[in-house]
A protein has these predicted regions:
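Core hydrophobic alpha-helical transmembrane segments of single-pass membrane proteins
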Residues: 13-19
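Surface-exposed patches in mature extracellular/periplasmic domains of secreted proteins
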Residues: 63, 75-93
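Sec/Tat signal peptide C-region and signal peptidase I cleavage site
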Residues: 21-29
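Bacterial N-terminal signal peptides that target proteins for export
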Residues: 2-13
Length: 131
């Protein structure tokens, strides 16, 4: 995955961000998800999807699932265009999202499975992310 991920990131980050993150930003406009993000109950994951930290009600779970379904559809399209795996595209977007979209005070999940809250320092990205 590392080689393909670096190639995808190096060659197509701008296009992926336009196609993928624009969809993500629109999808995250729901009030339940926005509130949960601000409270640290929902956060970005290194795998390119939203995650729920701890227990959540059915309505929040449904909205997070709906967002992740839209993300997967965007990742699937990009993967087909580039001839790579969906997982590689999702991880590349995950790297960009952790870098550019996780605000101070927001929760995020790295590949080690530990939820963290972003402080003033940049997030230490997984080794497969191109810096």
């Amino acid at each position: 995955m590392t080689r393909n991920l670096k190639i995808i990131t190096a060659l197509g980050t701008g296009l992926m961000l336009v196609a993928g993150v624009a969809t993500i930003a629109v999808a995250q406009a729901t009030s339940l998800v926005s509130v949960a993000l601000s409270q640290g109950d929902v956060g970005e994951q290194a795998d390119g999807y939203l995650g729920i930290k701890g227990a959540a009600n059915a309505a929040l779970r449904a909205e997070v699932d709906a967002i992740n379904i839209k993300r997967r559809a965007a990742y699937t399209q990009l993967a087909a265009q580039r001839g790579v795996t969906i997982k590689d595209v999702a991880a590349a977007i995950g790297c960009e999202t952790l870098t550019a979209r996780v605000a101070t005070g927001r929760a995020y999940l790295l590949t080690d499975g530990v939820w963290r809250v972003k402080g003033a320092a940049p997030i230490t990205l997984p080794a497969y992310c191109v810096s």
